[in-house]
A protein has these predicted regions:
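A short acidic, often aromatic-flanked loop/helix-cap motif at beta-alpha or helix-coil junctions
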Residues: 5-10, 65-66, 171
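Conserved alpha/beta core of the MobA/IspD/sugar-nucleotide pyrophosphorylase nucleotidyltransferase superfamily
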Residues: 22, 97, 111-193
Length: 193
C-alpha cells in the first residue's frame, strides 16, 4: 500500500522499493498511462543501462512521424496537454523534457524526405537504486513544478538521464493523457485482437 505523501510515480516507485526491501541493480517503473508500451521498450532500457554506468536513469523516446507530429501539434492548438517530448544531445543524454512540442520545427526548411527531429518521451523509467533513493530527498524544482514532469527533478539535480531511442516497429503508440486518448487507445487495442 502506498502512502498519500507520494506526489508522482517515481516517488511511489521509490517507496515501494524501500518497503519491499528490494536489492537490485536496476528498478523499472512501468506507469499505467502507457498501456500500448511494447515489451522491447523495457528490454532496450535494460540493455542501455547495462552499457552506460554513468546514467542515473533511462527512459525510452520514439521519433515522431509526420502524422503523429501533426496530432501533437493539433492537441496543443486545442489546449490539450499530453504527449511529452524530449530533447537530447549526441550522447543521448537528456537536455530537456516538455509538455510543449519541442524542438520547434520550421517545416518549410525540412525536406520532404527528412525525419522530424521531435521525440515522444514514453512514461517508462529504469533507475539505478541509489539515484531513485536520492530522488525522494531532492526538493521539487522550478522546472518540475512548472511542467509537471517528474523526470525533470533528475535534470535539475545534475543527474544524467539517458534517452533510449526505440521503434514502435509498426505498432501505433499513444499514451493516456487526455479523455480523447481513451478512444484512440481502445481502437488500437480492438484492432489488435
Amino acid at each position: 500500500r502506498q502512502s498519500s505523501h507520494c506526489r508522482n510515480g517515481t516517488e511511489r516507485c521509490a517507496e515501494a522499493v524501500e518497503n519491499a526491501r528490494l536489492d537490485s541493480d536496476l528498478i523499472i517503473n512501468f506507469q499505467g498511462d502507457a498501456p500500448l508500451t511494447p515489451p522491447w521498450f523495457v528490454e532496450n532500457l535494460i540493455h542501455a543501462m547495462g552499457e552506460d554506468d554513468k546514467s542515473s536513469m533511462a527512459t525510452p523516446v520514439v521519433r515522431l512521424d509526420r502524422v503523429t507530429y501533426g496530432h501533437f501539434l493539433q492537441d496543443r492548438k486545442k489546449g490539450l496537454v499530453g504527449g511529452t517530448t524530449a530533447v537530447f544531445g549526441v550522447d543521448k543524454y537528456a537536455l530537456y523534457f516538455s509538455k510543449e512540442v519541442i524542438p520547434f520545427v520550421d517545416m518549410e526548411k525540412l525536406s520532404a524526405e527528412s525525419d522530424i527531429p521531435v521525440f515522444h518521451h514514453v512514461g517508462v523509467y529504469a533507475y539505478r537504486p541509489d539515484a531513485l533513493s536520492s530522488y525522494v530527498e531532492w526538493p521539487i524544482g522550478e522546472l518540475e513544478r512548472l511542467e509537471g514532469l517528474e523526470q525533470l527533478r533528475f535534470l535539475e539535480n545534475n543527474q544524467l538521464v539517458k534517452c533510449v531511442s526505440v521503434s514502435a516497429q509498426g505498432r501505433v503508440f499513444w499514451e493516456l493523457n487526455n479523455p480523447d486518448d481513451v478512444d484512440r487507445i481502445e481502437k488500437v487495442i480492438e484492432a489488435s485482437l
